[in-house]
Amino acid sequence: MQEDSKVYDITVIGGGPVGLFTAFYGGMRQASVKIIESLPQLGGQLSALYPEKYIYDVAGFPKIRAQELVDNLKEQMDKFDQTICLEQAVETVEKQADGIFKLVTNQEIHYSKTIIITAGNGAFQPRKLELDAAESFEGSNLHYFINDLNQFAGRRVAVLGGGDSAVDWALMLEPIAKEVSIIHRRDKFRAHEHSVENLHNSKVNVVTPFVPTELIGEDRIEQIVLEEVKGDKKQVLDVDDVIVNFGFVSSLGPIKQWGLEIEKNSIVVKSTMETNIEGFYAAGDICTYEGKVKLIASGFGEAPTAVNNAKAYMDPKARVQPLHSTSLFENK
């Protein structure tokens, strides 16, 4: 296993929106920062699950696309030379006798003076389509994540699922794809009423109550066999792409073994955002305290609190209260 012997000031576990802002703010406090992210890209759930959806509750933006928000956060962070480690899941964390944290991932060993975990609801994985050969099509035209809607331009797309994500993707694909079908095992969808109304008023082919029973194709899925849930009807759908929206399963996983105080699947923090382990902080949806509200906006406020207190932990002479950003950047 590789080892990065450099000891960073702050290691951020989780590269979602709160993690990105944490890394930026660490740079503002002149700390060396490393981000460790388990996914292949930064942005967390915003990039992985709904990059094309709009967010309406971020201060200063009447609305902003999820991926655009991530891109802005990355641009903001890029003012500083932060180290990014992708596709690495932290498995163990140990505070050594010298006070330095040793973090072991599935690929590498890292060292840090402090840790700020911003891992959202923990690691998340999509619920898979459980059909023979489904896994073999994941690298071609069976999708659990969508990064660019335009890749489906002029194509026949089948969306599997009945929740908000499935309905939203079907509606967003309608003006782009050649043909969109949504397949759900029940007659009624579990999505927002307004979205369901829009779906039924759209040109999307609604197929209910049917389930996929077979995927036909060699290198790519060419057809899906659909069978009625309570009945004998069967139909075959020609497709170019299949998008699966059966939801996601999130778990704290190994985080529970790190000696942190956990309450209802969240890490308990003080008003400084410090956990029960000195030098180990948490921000965003993964942490909890009295009156906690799980919003991106809340996480953006918790990140500077964690960074400023981490700075004071590393250097007791440092001010917890920082200078205003205008002063910092004008002096550069």
Curated annotation (Swiss-Prot):
FAD binds at E37, Q45, Y50, V90, F124, D285, T326. Keywords: FAD, Flavoprotein, NADP, Oxidoreductase. Gene3D superfamilies: FAD/NAD(P)-binding domain. It catalyses: 2 reduced [2Fe-2S]-[ferredoxin] + NADP(+) + H(+) = 2 oxidized [2Fe-2S]-[ferredoxin] + NADPH. Binds 1 FAD per subunit. Transmembrane segments: none annotated. Its cofactor is FAD. The keyword NADP applies. Belongs to the ferredoxin--NADP reductase type 2 family. Homodimer. This is Ferredoxin--NADP reductase 2.
